[in-house]
Amino acid sequence: MNSFPLNHNDASYSQDARLYKGISSEKRLIKLTTIPQVLSSLELYANDLPALTWYGSNDERLHLNYEILLSEIRKVVHWLRMHHRIVCGDRVIVISSNCPEVYVLQIALMSLGAITVPVNNNESPMVFEKIVDKVNPKKILTGRDVESNLNSVISSKDNIPTIPFAYGEPTNDHKWDDSGVNADDPAVILFTSGTTSAPKGVCLSHYNLLVNAEGLGQVHNHSVNNVHMCIMPLFHANAFGFSLIGSLYAKNHVVLCSGLPGITFWKILKDNFINIVSLSPEIIRVLTEIHIPGEDFPSLRYVVSAAAPLPKKLATDFIKKTGIKIHQGYGLSECVNFAATVPWNISEKVFEDILNKWQVPSIGASLFGCTLDVLNKDGVQAANEEEGEIVVTGHTIMLGYWGDDEETSLALKGGMLHTGDLGFFSEINGEKFFFVTGRKKEIIIRYGENISPLTIEAELYKLRKIGFFAITGFFNESSGEEIGLYILANYTSENLNFIRHIIKSCPSRYKPRVVIFGKEKIPATPTGKIKRSILAERFKDFSKKSFGSDPVFIKE
């Protein structure tokens, strides 16, 4: 057993946050409560079913049924145990793009009772070092497409093995249900930006993951042998919780792509009889532009929009051009992934209402295992259509932030998960449907990824040489939010070249898309804290612009 370390003073908040309709998380809502139990069930009932089809970036393709998948997991378990002495409770950092190796490895680690720590393969070296310091990993395992600067830092560590595939001999005597893993043991640490430049590690238990998987199965009517397409990266909460764990739990067939396959997306969708695919709004925007007129996808029920708010215009454009419905979902790493989703069996009338009646499309109703609510400005339950902060309670709520009692206490203050998102609910046929209207916090959500402005400022610190600057997120229809850099410096060719050089050396995920050479004072409190929401107003003219790899430079 590997219990999550929690300050006893915070225990009551934590326990209250995990109540679901008055039921303690110690009273289980599901039968299979650990990954080893799920694997044991698959061995009994799913051996011949298709499990994984992979499309690589270089026309690579691989297909596994559950019998072969389980065999590969066993081989990697053996490799982890015998070659690296990985045991229950060990943290293992995993860095790779989507591929069969990383898919198998994540499951193998959790089946051992080890804690997998997926990290972005394009992560900043500075942030990566902070993650390493925080989790103190037993091993760092690398796979495909690791960014060169990050790879250099990783290579400086001792004895970094690559992720194996089909390694070693099968160990058929291994019993999944004899592994000694408990429901409340940590299974994964997903890193997300906080209100400081230090990343926060969201620690989720086996039970957290599997209650969410049950909820996903109910809301999307998952049944054995359904086909789920995964494009989003497996280090992201949506892909990890929905595509990996949710599909494994439901005995689904996953079609895994190493990235967005472009125009071939539609062929993959049709050839594999995809039933459901989870996409970010930006991917939906791209697919709207490259849709093949006249194509029909009879197997596809709908697209799930995730990771960032879905603009109404994008939703209506996509539906009009493709004839494919979009069911928006909402969640955070802190509650596994989805906490609310538009259900599979919604009526046509209600679907039209929640898409068009309000200024933003609905994120749906609460998922099984958790409950959404809205607190008004006075901190009490909001009335119908009254805006406030969205909060979540239930059995999917995280164990806490790894090694950070203070941040855990703040997040679960008052016995509920405070999301930092503003929204409201509207009762439709006796059920609360929720809507997200904005952000309470300053975190930038770009293409579904949480990024701290302070992290970006730390990456660009050399700009202080030419002037005071600040980073803010601003609304953008394509990405949800974009990164804006405001700098108090003269608009000269020398300064332009210097900023270009600094931005070019910055990881792509942190690169500003608009740079304003300003003259107005950067808004701040008396203590110097940047008022980013006010600063964002200076970037409002770029809400409809799509950006390339180079930033736009503006003289104010």
Please describe what each predicted stretch is:
Residues 63-67, 187-211:
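Conserved AMP-binding A3 loop
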Residues 506-530, 544-556:
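AMP-binding/adenylate-forming catalytic domain of the ANL superfamily
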Residues 210-227, 237-276, 289-291:
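Conserved AMP-binding/adenylation subdomain of ANL enzymes
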Residues 48-50, 173-191, 197-198, 221-227:
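Conserved pre-ATP/AMP-binding loop-to-beta segment of ANL
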Residues 362-369, 380-410, 449-451:
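Conserved ATP/PPi-binding loop(s) of AMP-dependent carboxylate-activating enzymes
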Residues 30, 48, 52-87, 93-99, ...:
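Conserved AMP-binding/adenylate-forming core of the ANL superfamily
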Residues 274-279, 288-357, 371:
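Gly/Ser/Thr-rich phosphate-binding loop
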Residues 123, 394, 399-400, 410, ...:
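AMP-binding/adenylate-forming catalytic core of the ANL superfamily
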